[in-house]
């Protein structure tokens, strides 16, 4: 019993060297490939594409060169905006050309939204996220639902209660790792099991990649116009906004074709 009390005291002690930090969910576009012209070239591949053309040495200029050459043939081809609108809005929609482009997003999101995004395995091609199994999460990032503060004294009370609950969970998380390792448990097992003290509002960093078509699927199902949870809707809207904000607006006509 004496040993149990000693362990309990160690677990309850504050761990001031770990920084609790409340954060909004955030999204950044790390990289991308493609644009309106690439979608058009992919659509024209079935009818007009001639790869015998002399292409520029700059590989990044070849999509535009192909687009210009195909349109210059003048065989009653639609303009790029008209073609993309036709593809997105025909019945049934022909969206495979929109899969040619690629986005890579970095994000800091809470666990609940991370789990929801994992269900979209068709739209999202790839996910890598930091793992509490392989490292001790030292930053203790967490999310608090700010809209609770709009609901008077009770909303504020539970907002503060959630914050205290989260901080306590983080203390127990670090305390459990230290105490269990000290008791002889392997550090890997201590880390992977102590994470059960982390709540659904614990945030993690992740990298996700998807095509333009995948992003539009995600937007249609999880954007702010949908009945989705506020947090995932905000993340999806931020992803779309990051694409809108790319210098030169290379996806302008593709976004318009989907009414975005």
Can you say where each PLM-predicted feature lies in the sequence?
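Family-specific signature for flavin-dependent thymidylate synthase
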Residues: 2-260
């Amino acid at each position: 019993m004496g040993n149990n009390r000693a362990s309990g005291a160690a677990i309850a002690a504050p761990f001031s060297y770990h920084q609790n930090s409340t954060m909004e969910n955030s999204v950044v576009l790390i990289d991308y490939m493609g644009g309106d012209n690439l979608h058009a070239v992919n659509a024209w591949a079935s009818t007009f594409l001639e790869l015998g053309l002399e292409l520029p040495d700059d590989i990044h200029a070849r999509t535009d060169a192909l687009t210009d050459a195909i349109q210059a043939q003048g065989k009653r081809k639609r303009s790029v905006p008209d073609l993309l609108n036709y593809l997105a809005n025909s019945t049934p929609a022909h969206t495979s050309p929109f899969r040619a482009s690629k986005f890579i997003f970095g994000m800091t999101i809470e666990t609940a939204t991370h789990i929801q995004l994992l269900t979209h395995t068709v739209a999202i091609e790839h996910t890598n996220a930091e793992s509490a199994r392989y490292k001790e999460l030292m930053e203790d990032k967490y999310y608090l639902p700010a809209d609770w503060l709009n609901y008077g004294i009770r909303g504020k009370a539970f907002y503060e209660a959630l914050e205290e609950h989260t901080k306590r969970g983080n203390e127990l998380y670090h305390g459990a790792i230290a105490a269990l390792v000290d008791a002889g448990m392997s550090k890997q097992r201590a880390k992977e099991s102590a994470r059960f003290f982390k709540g659904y509002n614990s945030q993690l960093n992740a990298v996700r990649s998807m095509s333009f078509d995948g992003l539009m699927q995600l937007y249609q199902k999880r954007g702010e116009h949908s009945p989705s949870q506020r947090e995932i809707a905000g993340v999806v809207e931020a992803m779309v906004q990051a694409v809108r904000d790319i210098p030169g607006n290379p996806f302008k006509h593709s976004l318009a074709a989907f009414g975005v």
